[in-house]
Amino acid sequence: MLMRRKNIKIEFRYDGSSYYGFQRQPNKITVQGEIEKVLRIVTKEEINLISAGRTDRGVHANHQVSNFYTSSNIPIEKYKYLLTRALPNDIDILSVEEVDENFNARHNAKMREYIYIISWEKNPFEARYCKFVKEKIVAEKLEKIFSDFIGVHDFKNFRLSDCVSKVTVREIYQIEVKYFGENKIKIYIKGSAFLKSQVRIMVGTALEIYYGRLLENHIRLMLNDFTKEYKKNLVEAEGLYLNKIEY
């Protein structure tokens, strides 16, 4: 009997500290690889996740969305239990549902939000989850620097050299810098999509301007001048989180 092919959407979160990024890599432990491994065992099929975002090594996710196709007859309500039981504790399945066969977690996403956390109080138990700086950051001053990113721009200068994306134009919808407790800020960056390490280079560049190590117009130069190679000011991965996906 031929089983009907189903399109399954899963929403999940993870601590990226122990993984070589999200995307599957040969002989490396990745988030995608761990989930696909469990799904192959459960469904007895070859599974390929289609995902909204591909985070770097050490980057976390509060909300990630993937979908996959399967002809397995496993009841949809059992997937969450089976995945949760088999996956490591640093990957948490939030929901599993069957969706329209045309749904694509990557291409249908309308907005992706990242957050970056910075702390000026050193804490060894938070070393994997934020960036430490020596002095308090003035949120309003940093947010003003980030405003140059808002809108549609070519982010060719805000990606690593191994980025394979042919289209480098992206739209940034909103950037907010908010205090979080007494010793932290969270930088919220909303956009259509992002290039490899784009957010980390954006944050790193803004911080260099904030500390006076780059001129105030440096972001505008990088967004408009493609005649030379600019230094990539890349902040640590540990403070970055894929926070929200909207469709």
Curated annotation (Swiss-Prot):
EC number, UniProt record: 5.4.99.12
Disulfide pattern: none
CDD domains assigned: PseudoU_synth_EcTruA
Keywords for the protein's UniProt record, in alphabetical order: Isomerase, tRNA processing
Database matches in SUPFAM superfamilies: Pseudouridine synthase
An MF annotation (GO) of this entry: RNA binding
Enzyme kind, highest EC tier: isomerase
BP GO terms, sorted: tRNA pseudouridine synthesis
Reaction catalysed by this enzyme: uridine(38/39/40) in tRNA = pseudouridine(38/39/40) in tRNA
Residues at the catalytic site: 56
Database matches in Pfam families: PseudoU_synth_1
Protein's job: Formation of pseudouridine at positions 38, 39 and 40 in the anticodon stem and loop of transfer RNAs.
Sequence similarity: Belongs to the tRNA pseudouridine synthase TruA family.
Subunit structure: Homodimer.
HAMAP family assigned: TruA
Protein name per UniProt: tRNA pseudouridine synthase A
